[in-house]
Protein backbone atom coordinates (compact mmCIF):
# COMPACT_ATOMS: atom_id res chain seq x y z
CA UNK A 1 0.00 0.00 0.00
CA UNK A 2 1.30 3.46 -0.90
CA UNK A 3 2.24 5.93 1.81
CA UNK A 4 0.00 8.91 2.60
CA UNK A 5 1.28 11.55 0.16
CA UNK A 6 -0.25 14.52 1.98
CA UNK A 7 2.02 14.56 5.02
CA UNK A 8 4.95 12.40 3.96
CA UNK A 9 7.95 14.47 2.91
CA UNK A 10 9.72 11.42 1.48
CA UNK A 11 6.87 10.88 -0.98
CA UNK A 12 7.08 14.52 -2.05
CA UNK A 13 10.86 14.50 -2.54
CA UNK A 14 10.88 11.15 -4.35
CA UNK A 15 8.11 12.28 -6.70
CA UNK A 16 9.79 15.65 -7.33
CA UNK A 17 13.06 13.93 -8.18
CA UNK A 18 11.43 11.54 -10.66
CA UNK A 19 9.46 14.44 -12.18
CA UNK A 20 12.59 16.50 -12.87
CA UNK A 21 15.11 13.77 -13.70
CA UNK A 22 12.96 11.22 -15.53
CA UNK A 23 9.44 12.36 -16.42
CA UNK A 24 10.26 15.72 -18.04
CA UNK A 25 13.30 14.67 -20.11
CA UNK A 26 12.47 11.02 -20.85
CA UNK A 27 8.67 10.80 -20.98
CA UNK A 28 7.55 14.30 -21.99
CA UNK A 29 10.79 14.79 -23.96
CA UNK A 30 11.03 18.49 -23.15
CA UNK A 31 14.18 20.42 -23.94
CA UNK A 32 17.02 20.60 -21.42
CA UNK A 33 16.27 24.31 -20.97
CA UNK A 34 12.67 23.49 -20.02
CA UNK A 35 13.86 20.92 -17.49
CA UNK A 36 16.14 23.55 -15.96
CA UNK A 37 13.35 26.15 -15.88
CA UNK A 38 10.94 23.72 -14.18
CA UNK A 39 13.61 22.56 -11.72
CA UNK A 40 14.48 26.14 -10.85
CA UNK A 41 10.79 27.03 -10.46
CA UNK A 42 10.32 24.17 -8.03
CA UNK A 43 13.46 25.20 -6.13
CA UNK A 44 12.26 28.81 -5.86
CA UNK A 45 8.95 27.64 -4.39
CA UNK A 46 10.76 25.34 -1.95
CA UNK A 47 13.01 28.26 -0.93
CA UNK A 48 9.88 30.37 -0.40
CA UNK A 49 8.37 27.70 1.85
CA UNK A 50 11.62 27.52 3.80
CA UNK A 51 12.35 31.23 4.18
CA UNK A 52 8.90 32.83 4.17
CA UNK A 53 6.62 30.12 5.55
CA UNK A 54 9.22 28.66 7.96
CA UNK A 55 8.72 25.12 6.67
CA UNK A 56 12.01 23.24 6.80
CA UNK A 57 13.03 21.70 3.48
CA UNK A 58 13.12 18.22 5.00
CA UNK A 59 9.52 18.63 6.19
CA UNK A 60 7.94 19.83 2.93
CA UNK A 61 5.05 17.68 1.75
CA UNK A 62 2.08 18.01 -0.59
CA UNK A 63 0.12 19.43 2.32
CA UNK A 64 2.16 22.62 1.80
CA UNK A 65 0.81 23.07 -1.75
CA UNK A 66 -2.49 24.65 -0.70
CA UNK A 67 -4.29 27.19 -2.84
CA UNK A 68 -3.69 29.86 -0.18
CA UNK A 69 0.04 29.09 -0.03
CA UNK A 70 0.39 29.29 -3.81
CA UNK A 71 -1.61 32.53 -3.87
CA UNK A 72 0.64 34.07 -1.19
CA UNK A 73 3.67 32.83 -3.16
CA UNK A 74 2.37 34.65 -6.24
CA UNK A 75 1.85 37.84 -4.21
CA UNK A 76 5.34 37.52 -2.73
CA UNK A 77 6.94 37.06 -6.16
CA UNK A 78 5.14 40.11 -7.55
CA UNK A 79 5.28 42.50 -4.62
CA UNK A 80 8.40 41.55 -2.65
CA UNK A 81 10.68 40.02 -5.26
CA UNK A 82 9.32 42.38 -7.96
CA UNK A 83 9.32 39.63 -10.59
CA UNK A 84 7.55 40.18 -13.89
CA UNK A 85 4.09 38.67 -14.34
CA UNK A 86 5.49 36.42 -17.06
CA UNK A 87 8.11 34.98 -14.67
CA UNK A 88 5.48 34.43 -11.98
CA UNK A 89 3.25 32.62 -14.45
CA UNK A 90 6.14 30.41 -15.59
CA UNK A 91 6.85 29.37 -12.00
CA UNK A 92 3.19 28.64 -11.27
CA UNK A 93 2.90 26.66 -14.51
CA UNK A 94 5.82 24.48 -13.40
CA UNK A 95 4.13 23.85 -10.04
CA UNK A 96 0.86 22.98 -11.79
CA UNK A 97 2.66 20.59 -14.11
CA UNK A 98 4.33 18.91 -11.15
CA UNK A 99 1.03 18.57 -9.30
CA UNK A 100 -0.65 17.13 -12.40
CA UNK A 101 2.14 14.57 -12.69
CA UNK A 102 1.79 13.82 -8.98
CA UNK A 103 -1.91 12.98 -9.39
CA UNK A 104 -0.93 10.23 -11.84
CA UNK A 105 1.15 8.69 -9.06
CA UNK A 106 -1.22 9.51 -6.19
CA UNK A 107 -4.83 10.10 -7.32
CA UNK A 108 -5.72 11.30 -3.82
CA UNK A 109 -3.81 14.50 -4.63
CA UNK A 110 -6.37 15.48 -7.29
CA UNK A 111 -8.10 17.95 -4.95
CA UNK A 112 -4.84 19.85 -4.42
CA UNK A 113 -4.12 19.93 -8.16
CA UNK A 114 -7.64 21.13 -9.02
CA UNK A 115 -7.53 23.84 -6.35
CA UNK A 116 -4.12 25.16 -7.37
CA UNK A 117 -4.78 24.96 -11.11
CA UNK A 118 -7.96 27.01 -10.64
CA UNK A 119 -5.90 30.03 -9.58
CA UNK A 120 -5.85 32.77 -12.19
CA UNK A 121 -2.53 33.54 -13.75
CA UNK A 122 -1.15 37.05 -13.41
CA UNK A 123 -2.36 39.33 -16.18
CA UNK A 124 0.39 40.26 -18.59
CA UNK A 125 0.55 42.98 -21.19
CA UNK A 126 1.79 42.06 -24.60
CA UNK A 127 4.35 44.25 -26.21
CA UNK A 128 3.72 44.88 -29.89
CA UNK A 129 6.09 42.98 -32.13
CA UNK A 130 8.55 45.27 -33.81
CA UNK A 131 9.73 44.29 -37.25
CA UNK A 132 12.88 45.25 -39.08
CA UNK A 133 12.44 47.86 -41.74
CA UNK A 134 13.34 46.67 -45.23
CA UNK A 135 16.57 48.70 -45.12
CA UNK A 136 17.60 47.18 -41.75
CA UNK A 137 16.86 43.64 -42.94
CA UNK A 138 18.85 44.17 -46.11
CA UNK A 139 21.83 45.47 -44.09
CA UNK A 140 21.64 42.48 -41.74
CA UNK A 141 21.53 39.92 -44.55
CA UNK A 142 24.32 41.65 -46.46
CA UNK A 143 26.63 41.79 -43.42
CA UNK A 144 28.23 38.34 -43.99
CA UNK A 145 30.83 38.29 -46.77
CA UNK A 146 29.33 36.29 -49.69
CA UNK A 147 32.82 35.66 -51.13
CA UNK A 148 33.75 33.29 -48.31
CA UNK A 149 32.33 29.94 -47.36
CA UNK A 150 31.76 31.14 -43.77
CA UNK A 151 30.02 34.28 -45.01
CA UNK A 152 27.67 32.28 -47.26
CA UNK A 153 26.96 29.90 -44.36
CA UNK A 154 26.22 32.76 -41.99
CA UNK A 155 23.96 34.47 -44.51
CA UNK A 156 22.04 31.25 -45.02
CA UNK A 157 21.68 30.84 -41.26
CA UNK A 158 20.33 34.38 -40.93
CA UNK A 159 17.82 33.78 -43.72
CA UNK A 160 16.73 30.48 -42.17
CA UNK A 161 16.37 32.03 -38.71
CA UNK A 162 14.34 34.91 -40.09
CA UNK A 163 12.09 32.78 -42.31
CA UNK A 164 11.35 30.13 -39.67
CA UNK A 165 11.45 32.24 -36.48
CA UNK A 166 13.62 29.49 -35.01
CA UNK A 167 15.93 30.03 -32.08
CA UNK A 168 19.67 29.80 -32.62
CA UNK A 169 19.81 26.75 -30.32
CA UNK A 170 17.14 25.05 -32.45
CA UNK A 171 19.05 25.81 -35.63
CA UNK A 172 22.25 24.38 -34.13
CA UNK A 173 20.45 21.13 -33.30
CA UNK A 174 19.41 20.53 -36.93
CA UNK A 175 20.98 17.46 -38.50
CA UNK A 176 20.92 15.91 -41.93
CA UNK A 177 19.42 12.43 -42.07
Predicted regions and their residues:
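Conserved catalytic core of the tyrosine transesterase superfamily
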Residues: 1-177
